[in-house]
Structure formats: C-alpha cells, structure tokens
Amino acid sequence: MNRRYLYPILTILVVVILYYAEKYVNKQTEAYPDTSKVLVESSQEFSENLLPTSTTGAIVTHGFFTLSYSEPHEQAEWVAYELSKSHLSNNEFERPYFVEDREVKTGSADWRNYKNSGYDRGHLCPAGDRRFSYEAYHETFLTSNISPQNREFNSGVWNFLEQKVRYWAKKYDGVYVVTGGVLKEGLPTIGDENVSVPEEFYKIILDASDGNFKVLAFLIPNKATNESFYEFVVPVDDIE
C-alpha cells in the first residue's frame, strides 16, 4: 500500500484514540500476547478537532460503521467500526439480499458484478459482528461493505481472524477495527463495473482500554493458506 492509502488508516486510528481515551482510561486491561510486532503508544494529548481523512473524500457514516468509498475501485478503501463487548451476540436473522448503498454519491457497485466471478462477496465489517440487532446486521449487506475475496481465504484465515477479533472484543471490553483491501493501480477486475480484486487485505485492531493504546495489524494475501493469521502480523508502518 502506498503512502496515500496509508494516511487515512493512520488518521482514523488517531481519531479512535481521541474518542475512546476518556472512555477507557480507568478500566482494567490485559495486554495482547507478547510480540515485538505489536505497536504500543501512550499519549493523552490529541486534538479533539481531528477528523478522519479520505483519499477520495467519499466518507459515508452509517449507523454501525463508517467507510471511505473508492469509486475507481468500486469498493471501500477502508471500513471502520467499534466492536464492543455488548455487540457480541448469537442472534440468528434471515440473510438479506445485498443492496447498493444509496449514501455513496457515485453509487456503490451492483452485487451482480460478483456473480460467476469466482470470488466471494467478502464482508469488510462482518455480519457476525452485527448480530445484536437486525438493523445492524442488515446494514452489513450494503455493497459498499464488500470486496472480492478468494473463497478459501474468506472462509479460512480471514474468517478465523474475524472470530479472534470477537474474542478480543470480549476479553478487552471492546476494540476498534479498521479494515479493507489494499487498493492500487493495475489490479484485476470483475464485472461490468470493473470492481478491483485486492491482492491483500489488512485489518488493524485497536485496544485503548486503559489509555495505553495497543494496535495490532494484519496484512494477509487474498488467497488460500493453511498458515495461522498470526503469521501475517505486521507493524502498522508496514501497511504501505
């Protein structure tokens, strides 16, 4: 990922730190597993006027996640959301159809671009993270929240990482997530609208439960693998 795609990710992380510092500062916390790849920062001085930025200017705030839409790639360059302990639920809802996101001014890609493409309609904010209400669950089926994912990747290492994030949300009383595909020029595309197929996906998890901000980042190739997601832990600075 080049620097122009890195900046909005890093900025949204700072914004999250700003937002949750006071909320979590007095709560008890446990550390992430000991690893040199975990970035830990501790600072209480941030501008409360700092806002997320976007390389496209197409930021859309929904009820249960926020995204920055990239029209050239017909998908979000990042999706950001909080996963609190109270969000965790085993509720079962009827699976809705994917629908276009009317809040995206240029129009999000039609789900039919994925039909017979060989790729899954991979959620960025997982439906499994939004089972606490039907409205929240339904919102994850907006096509602005999906990206073409290799089927084995989606059901394998990416799914296992999503499950682990839920575990961390329960253990650390909530986390904040920024995730998306690595978007760049020259990617293969699918469908009539030329939806880009990312070669890699990233997921950045922030825990600010005691004011000592812990960030764990993953960068995983969009292909089948038998390796653990822990093999793809990277410093946040490497996601460029």
Language-model features: where?
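Domain-level detector for secreted/extracellular nuclease and nuclease-toxin modules, and
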Residues: 2-240
